[in-house]
Amino acid sequence: MKAKPLSQDPGSKRYAYRINKEENRKELKHVKINESSLVQEGQKIDLPKKRYYRQRAHSNPFSDHQLEYPVSPQDMDWSKLYPYYKNAENGQMTKKVTIADIGCGFGGLMIDLSPAFPEDLILGMEIRVQVTNYVEDRIIALRNNTASKHGFQNINVLRGNAMKFLPNFFEKGQLSKMFFCFPDPHFKQRKHKARIITNTLLSEYAYVLKEGGVVYTITDVKDLHEWMVKHLEEHPLFERLSKEWEENDECVKIMRNATEEGKKVERKKGDKFVACFTRLPTPAIL
């Protein structure tokens, strides 16, 4: 008889760890931590351990992942992700998400952006199940363990496929910044259609990005960098920002070193290729 994977074996340490985290996550990810009966006042929550969230490095964006997504942005209940910003009287959100990290991985960029942009709601979108669970547990722990009650309340993650459903979550011109950090390079030519930057997808990004908003890209693969630059430069609604602008921008400084992939490249003394583009005004129709 074929043995069960450790992640599904009821007797394994990883299985027990996941079940325990999952039970806590169901309640804690949708409420204000200090209002939950699961956490006593002053009690610390351990940060999650990556070894218990094993996941393949990449996921096929064209597969049917049975994802949940709203029919339209108006149907999205953001209060479940950002309970601190829900108006207690009318139940409405006091802010909208304005910064998106597409393919956020283990959440390093969001966590560094949170204190840098305390007035903005920041969302990470990640297609892989266990990676999403890890980021959720990481944010729960950070929210609970931070002395300031505002700490990390402005970030969260959801499992979603940005290549298919981005306009289902965001209104026209809602976002001010979009990050594409170390995306899957899809080296084989027949796989290039699965890259996160394509002509078709750029039109969707332009739709949800406000005029003057910025697309940030970074990769350690030169071929992918050239591909992203080529497609963004060819699109009529994007214009590349100068090297001087990149050197002075706070987000670029954070993006270079905040992500887990960025730290890995740094350890290996590899190259990091950055390109930033601004969203141009939509031409008037005469």
UniProtKB/Swiss-Prot annotation:
The active site is at D184. It comes from Saccharomyces cerevisiae (strain ATCC 204508 / S288c) (Baker's yeast). One of its GO terms (biological process) is tRNA (guanine-N7)-methylation. This is tRNA (guanine-N(7)-)-methyltransferase. It catalyses: guanosine(46) in tRNA + S-adenosyl-L-methionine = N(7)-methylguanosine(46) in tRNA + S-adenosyl-L-homocysteine. Its EC number is 2.1.1.33. Belongs to the class I-like SAM-binding methyltransferase superfamily. TrmB family. The keyword rRNA processing does not apply. InterPro entries: SAM-dependent_MTases_sf, Trm8_euk, tRNA_(Gua-N-7)_MeTrfase_Trmb.
